[in-house]
């Protein structure tokens, strides 16, 4: 049986004709039987694709034949094409939607004016040398931090990346402007842009983790500064490092919104026609229509009606 894998990658580099790049990517992935999501802009490319391992290897080789993508780093993860509903290749103004396409500047070396890149071991060294002065700043949506984050991290109140500029300009984080700030996100791409936005707004000492949380977790498992699970954007929805939740060093952060039981599984509220919330829910509460809700009053009412109908 053929082994399947998921590839995660991004590359900031000028792309003169994003539409032509989109057509090339779509045709190549269809030929190789890969599924996933690829976003392309004039600033670069951001992709997550899954499929047969041999097909993934051929994809990597083809990508590196293109001059602008030769230095692209590909991360391999467990999974395959079955983890994605389809192949989606699109052109956008931004490959990560911060709402500031005109502010981002890139050249052949990547983002201009971003934070200093640190390898995982350099992150630990910075904390050893600077202690509690170091601030970890979560560059993801706040929801993702419910199941995992760096120890004592600052988690901004954001639902989407579009909210970050408003948050940075709110004054809430001005106390961090003279401190060493380590921005972090899943694979590193969001912090490439976020660190640049922060520097443009007066944050003086900004760092980012090479390879993001994924690379740090691969290096240290549950024995470093990371706590809990990692939210991922495929059908798995979360992953763990080391030996997972059974690891003695694993710290459980996620808990069911209804009963408080430990869980890392996000589920849709029962009121899917009106509510788009993903909430942490244990299997028992998800199976019961009465508790399969996000906790908002109207959604509780919808859940109660569903439970009553099921009881008839």
From Swiss-Prot:
Rhodanese domain residues:
130-225
Q: Which SMART domains match?
A: RHOD
GO annotation, biological process:
tRNA modification
List of catalytic residues: 185 (cysteine persulfide intermediate)
Q: Does the keyword tRNA processing apply?
A: yes
The catalytic activity of this protein is classed by the Enzyme Commission as: 1.14.-.-
Q: Does the keyword Endoplasmic reticulum apply?
A: no
Q: Which UniProt keywords apply?
A: Oxidoreductase, tRNA processing
| CDD domains according to UniProt | RHOD_YceA
- Which transformation does this protein catalyse, written as a reaction? uridine(34) in tRNA + AH2 + O2 = 5-hydroxyuridine(34) in tRNA + A + H2O
Which molecular function terms from Gene Ontology are attached? oxidoreductase activity, acting on paired donors, with incorporation or reduction of molecular oxygen
| InterPro entries from the UniProt entry | Rhodanese-like_dom, Rhodanese-like_dom_sf, Rhodanese_C, TrhO, TRHO_N
| Pfam entry (one) | Rhodanese
Q: Which SUPFAM superfamilies match?
A: Rhodanese/Cell cycle control phosphatase
Protein family: Belongs to the TrhO family.
Q: What does this protein do?
A: Catalyzes oxygen-dependent 5-hydroxyuridine (ho5U) modification at position 34 in tRNAs.
**Alphabetized PANTHER family for the sequence:** THIOSULFATE SULFURTRANSFERASE/RHODANESE-LIKE DOMAIN-CONTAINING PROTEIN 2, THIOSULFATE SULFURTRANSFERASE_RHODANESE-LIKE DOMAIN-CONTAINING PROTEIN 2
Put simply, this protein is called tRNA uridine(34) hydroxylase
């Amino acid at each position: 049986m053929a082994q399947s894998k998921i590839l995660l990658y991004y590359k900031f580099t000028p792309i003169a004709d994003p539409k032509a790049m989109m057509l090339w990517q779509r045709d190549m992935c269809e030929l190789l039987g890969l599924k996933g999501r690829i976003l392309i802009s004039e600033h670069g490319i951001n992709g997550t694709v899954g499929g047969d391992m041999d097909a993934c290897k051929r994809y990597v080789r083809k990508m590196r034949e293109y001059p602008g993508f030769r230095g692209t780093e590909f991360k391999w993860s467990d999974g395959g094409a079955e983890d994605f509903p389809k192949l989606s290749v699109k052109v956008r103004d931004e490959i990560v939607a911060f709402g500031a396409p005109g502010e981002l500047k890139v050249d052949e070396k990547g983002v201009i004016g971003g934070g200093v890149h640190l390898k995982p071991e350099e992150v630990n060294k910075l904390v050893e040398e600077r202690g509690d002065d170091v601030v970890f700043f979560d560059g993801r949506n706040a929801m993702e931090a419910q199941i995992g984050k760096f120890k004592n991290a600052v988690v901004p109140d954001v639902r989407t990346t579009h909210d970050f500029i408003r948050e940075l300009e709110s004054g809430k984080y001005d106390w961090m402007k003279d401190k060493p700030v380590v921005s972090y996100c899943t694979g590193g791409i969001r912090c490439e842009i976020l660190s640049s936005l922060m520097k443009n707004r007066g944050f003086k000492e900004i760092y980012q983790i090479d390879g993001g949380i994924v690379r740090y977790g691969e290096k240290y498992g549950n024995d470093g500064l990371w706590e809990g699970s990692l939210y991922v954007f495929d059908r798995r929805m979360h992953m763990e490092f080391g030996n997972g939740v059974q690891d003695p060093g694993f710290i459980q952060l996620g808990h069911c919104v209804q009963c408080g039981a430990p869980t890392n599984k996000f589920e849709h509220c029962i009121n899917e026609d009106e509510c788009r919330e993903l909430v942490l829910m244990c299997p028992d509460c998800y199976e019961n229509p009465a508790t399969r809700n996000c906790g908002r009053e109207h959604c509780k009412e919808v859940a109660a009606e569903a439970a009553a109908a099921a009881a008839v």
